[in-house]
Amino acid sequence: MMRPPMRITAACRLLFNVVLATASVPVLAQAPPPPSPPAGTDAYTLGPDSQPQPGVPRGKVEGPLIWKSRVFPNTVREYWIYVPAQYDPSVPAAVMIFQDGHKYVNVEQEYRAPIVMDNLIHRKEMPVTIGLFVNPGHDSETFPENRFRVSNRSVEYDTPNGDYARMLIDELLPELAKRYTLTTDPERRALVGASSGGICAFTAAWERPDYFRKVVSHIGSFTNIRGGYHYPFLLRRTDKKPLRVFLQDGSNDLDNQFGNWPLANQSMAAALKFKGYDYRFEFGDGGHTHKHGGAILPDTLRWLWRDVR
């Protein structure tokens, strides 16, 4: 006797996605470094806004500081705080939170966010903004030399749920507010990240637009590491949210078992356009590197904050 065809229920699909995502974690942890882009591509250089300029007052950077999260128990993370020279405790400051904070806070590598913020705040091309540079959690206070290899990065960054936003809202922002006067306006809070940090920035704003409404994603991993490839479809089928989104990627970005990064980012941009979002997509010829994102960070922040002072 023939058996009736098996019905694939929503629960079955969810279980399949969980198993698939879980199975991918060991592979991800052992993945080799991304290949170098072809010769003659990814030739991006830093401009004057990424260099210290005469007459521009410098903000101060504190850190690394240590945080032990309740949302992600048994993890330890580093974070840094940037405070611009123009900060006035009587005036609430805007807030910009950088994922993989060690990369963005470094003033000798590609992004040099403190220098860029010094220059743009000085010229009033962005508001007086406190920067919070946060690393993912690790299972020990002995961190790996390569901070991208901390143990909880993929769990926190690639999982498309509200846990990471909850850590920011319930833990780190209140901790920061003990020391500085911060805005409560979601239009004056931004999230920035690269690769898995890029999808993390988007996820936190997507889940909590009542807290975060500005997003910058560099070479964002909108692929099937833990289910983030669903976002272009969710964007099209979900009521528009009050978000402003900047995406950057390159034609030589990754293509592996988790997906194709250039196609994933193009799909995100197409979905944002279809839904009428305030977005910008910069698509170059770079690979899975920080050169393009770093070179255009000043213009990115000018665009992101263009109507906020």
Please annotate each region the language model reported.
Residues 30-309:
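Non-catalytic cap/lid and distal C-terminal segments of serine-dependent acyl enzymes
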